[in-house]
């Protein structure tokens, strides 16, 4: 879960926050930020000092801490730091699996679909899946109607998200 990879650091060095803004995507060597801490790859940070803050990520490939930009994908903008981190992880070709968890309606599916469609040339297929738990573990075969009538209401939230992305 991405939430387990997010850490807020209060009273962080104002100088390092400024350097991170200046460095952009290039980043700053991890030892500069966390000299005595062992950190895991692709951890995300909210670094704060008073009213100043920056969203950051540890890139284990380049061994730098870099500023996380609020990406725009198909006109979809992150509304908060968690969505910015999620979209950053979803768009990072060095991260092969991203697990997003959270309450319904927080944008997980929309961000995942937008990121997948943005990168569609990198993949042969995009699979949309939903957990069967939402059906109270009922077998679809026992529901009345043909396969489209059975699956359509269940898949409608995915189609709704695709419609938002399309327009």
What are these regions (language model features)?
Residues 75-94:
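N-terminal pre-P-loop "Q-motif" helix
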Residues 65-70, 94, 132-141:
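Short acidic (Asp/Glu) and glycine-rich catalytic loops that position anionic groups and cofactors
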Residues 105-107:
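Conserved glycine(s) of the Walker
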Residues 97:
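Walker A (P-loop) ATP-phosphate-binding motif of ABC ATPase nucleotide-binding domains
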Residues 71-73, 102:
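Short, basic, glycine/proline-bearing loop/turn elements
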Residues 2-69:
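Interdomain "pre-motor" coupling segment immediately N-terminal to P-loop NTPase/helicase cores
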Residues 110-167:
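Conserved P-loop
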């Amino acid at each position: 879960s991405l939430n387990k990879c997010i850490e807020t650091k209060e009273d962080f060095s104002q100088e390092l926050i400024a350097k991170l803004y200046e460095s952009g995507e290039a980043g700053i060597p991890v030892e500069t930020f966390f000299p005595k801490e062992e950190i895991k790859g692709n951890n995300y940070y909210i670094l704060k000092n008073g009213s100043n803050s920056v969203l950051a990520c540890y890139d284990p490939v380049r061994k730098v801490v870099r500023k996380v930009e609020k990406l725009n994908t198909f006109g979809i903008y992150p509304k908060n730091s968690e969505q910015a981190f999620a979209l950053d992880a979803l768009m990072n070709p060095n991260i092969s699996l991203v697990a997003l968890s959270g309450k319904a309606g927080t944008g997980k599916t929309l961000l995942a679909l937008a990121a997948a469609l943005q990168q569609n040339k990198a993949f042969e297929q995009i699979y949309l899946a939903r957990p069967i738990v939402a059906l109270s573990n009922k077998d679809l075969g026992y529901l009345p109607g043909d396969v489209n009538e059975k699956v359509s209401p269940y898949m409608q939230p995915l189609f709704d998200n695709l419609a938002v992305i399309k327009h």
